[in-house]
Amino acid sequence: MDFSISSSPVLLRPLEPEDLELLYTIENDATLWDVCDDTTPYSRYALRQYIANQPQDLHQCRELRLIIVERQTAAPIGIVDLVNYSPKNQRAEISIALLRHKRGKGYGEKSIFLLEEYTQRFYGIRMLYALVSSRNNALANSMFKSLGYECIACLPQWHKRGDDFEDIDVFQKILEKRR
C-alpha cells in the first residue's frame, strides 16, 4: 500500500525492513527526544525486531507507523505516526519526524495532508490532534496552523525537558466529511 495524491511530492507507505537506517537515524536523534518520551537510544537489533513485529492493523494495535517517501528520489525521509486511536470516537493523535535536512521544506505539511486523506477514507477518522511543545517549536506550531489545526488547549508543565517542565499545546482538526 502506497498512498499518495498525484500532485504531492511525498507518498506514505508501510514500514519495510529497508527502513532500518531511517528508523535508526530518527529514533536516535537526541534533539527529538525533547519532544517525546524517549530518552534512550535504540540499537539496530532492537529496531530490526520492531520492524519485523510491527503490526499494520490500526484497529488491532491502535497505532500505525507510516514512512514518508520523497516522490522524486523514492528515498524515505521521515515517519508519521498515528497513536491513541479511538475507533469509537473516530480520533487519533498524530506525530511526525523528518530527517534534519528535509525539515522546513513543506514535506511535513504534505505528509499530514496525505495522512488526513488516508485516515478519513480508510478508517473513518473525523478528528486528528497533536501535542506540540509551546516553548520552542515554532516550525511545528506554524505547520499545524497552516493545515487548519486549532490550538484548543495548553497543558501547563506537561513535559519535562532537562531540569524544567514545559507547556504543551494541543492542536486539533475536525476533518470535513468527504463526498
PLM regions and their residue ranges:
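Short amphipathic alpha-helix that is part of the acyltransferase structural core
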Residues: 10-11, 16-36
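A short helix-loop-beta-strand connector motif used in the catalytic cores of GNAT acetyltransferases and
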Residues: 54-67
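N-terminal cationic-hydrophobic initiation segments that often serve targeting/anchoring roles
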Residues: 24, 55-58, 120
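Conserved GNAT-fold acetyl-CoA-binding loop/helix
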Residues: 31-53
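Acyl-donor (CoA/ACP) binding surface of acyl/acetyltransferases
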Residues: 1-19, 65, 69-179
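Short, P/G- and charge-enriched loop/turn segments at secondary-structure junctions
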Residues: 53-56, 158-160
